[in-house]
């Protein structure tokens, strides 16, 4: 299979179950909603070394937010509900409550699983916090130096999927990075997905295990072009750079749509030679996304 002359390898991406919550961050302007959202999703690339996986899902207008102000939807993901509850508490408390004019609402109010995150955060008000109703939602008003912070009492969470992915093989680093950027921009239009790595792009693909017993994962030596003379690089001679796009999503359908949009965008960039995907022969996760099926 080819798209615009780019080979699509007959392989699959391997995803795994993850718990996730959507937070609707609002503020007086889109800029401040984005500032809060960026802080709240920082240090959230992989649960291998971060407290959570997190990213910006998309910007929303006042017609889509509980308080009618500009907003940003973010997704926060953890392997278990207990860790997710802690991540919500700390990320909202340290990154959104502290942001000028920001407020935080649940983006999954109808989810079966609910955390009383807002109630716990309300104690920051030192007894002066007040409970209120807004658009049928229970919220807490916490007094701050710059005005009240509004936070919804409960935040919903669902079973999502992490680890949807594809690999971009390119003639040079510039072409590969441009293709990766184009892919991330296309994925950004797909609701229910995030690309949690820096700018949505992974430069440091990894393999399971290492020569060092204390490491669970190490650099993907087979794809490191500087290791050709060491005899461990398996890349074709015309490939000089590989970038990976990792996608977390609320459903299989969302991840499949994001992969399709991203791959098609990447294949329009000159210098892209092949699209592949990372998997662990079905040993890591229960969700498989065959590239050719996703692109049909």
Residue ranges, per PLM feature:
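Conserved mixed alpha/beta catalytic, RNA-binding, or beta-rich assembly cores of soluble enzyme
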Residues: 2-10, 14, 22-57, 74, ...
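Glycine-rich phosphate/pyrophosphate-binding loop regions near the starts of catalytic domains
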Residues: 62-71, 75
């Amino acid at each position: 299979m080819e798209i615009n002359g780019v080979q699509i390898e007959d392989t699959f991406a391997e995803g795994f179950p993850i718990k996730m919550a959507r937070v609707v961050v609002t503020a007086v302007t889109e800029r401040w909603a984005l500032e809060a959202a960026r802080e709240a999703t920082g240090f959230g690339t992989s649960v291998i070394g971060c407290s959570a996986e997190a990213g910006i899902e998309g910007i929303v207008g006042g017609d889509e937010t509980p308080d009618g102000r500009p907003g940003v939807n973010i997704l926060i993901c953890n392997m278990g509900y207990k860790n997710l509850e802690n991540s919500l508490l700390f990320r909202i408390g340290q990154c959104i409550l502290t942001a000028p004019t920001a407020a935080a609402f649940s983006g999954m109010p109808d989810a079966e699983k609910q955390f009383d995150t807002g109630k716990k955060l309300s104690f920051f008000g030192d007894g002066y916090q007040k409970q209120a109703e807004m658009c049928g939602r229970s919220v807490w008003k916490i007094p701050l130096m710059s005005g009240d912070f509004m936070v919804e009492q409960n935040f919903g969470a669902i079973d999502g999927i992490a680890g949807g992915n594809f690999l971009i093989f390119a003639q040079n680093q510039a072409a590969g990075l441009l293709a990766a950027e184009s892919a991330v921009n296309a994925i950004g239009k797909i609701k229910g997905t995030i690309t949690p790595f820096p700018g949505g792009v992974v430069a440091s693909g990894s393999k399971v295990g290492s020569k060092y017993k204390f490491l669970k994962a190490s650099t993907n030596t087979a794809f490191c072009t500087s290791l050709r003379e060491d005899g461990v690089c398996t890349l074709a001679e015309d490939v000089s750079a590989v970038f990976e796009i990792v996608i977390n999503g609320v459903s299989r359908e969302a991840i499949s749509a994001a992969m399709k949009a991203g791959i098609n965008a990447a294949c329009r960039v000159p210098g892209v030679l092949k699209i592949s995907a990372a998997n662990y022969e079905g040993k890591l996760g229960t969700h498989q996304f065959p590239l050719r099926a996703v692109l049909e």
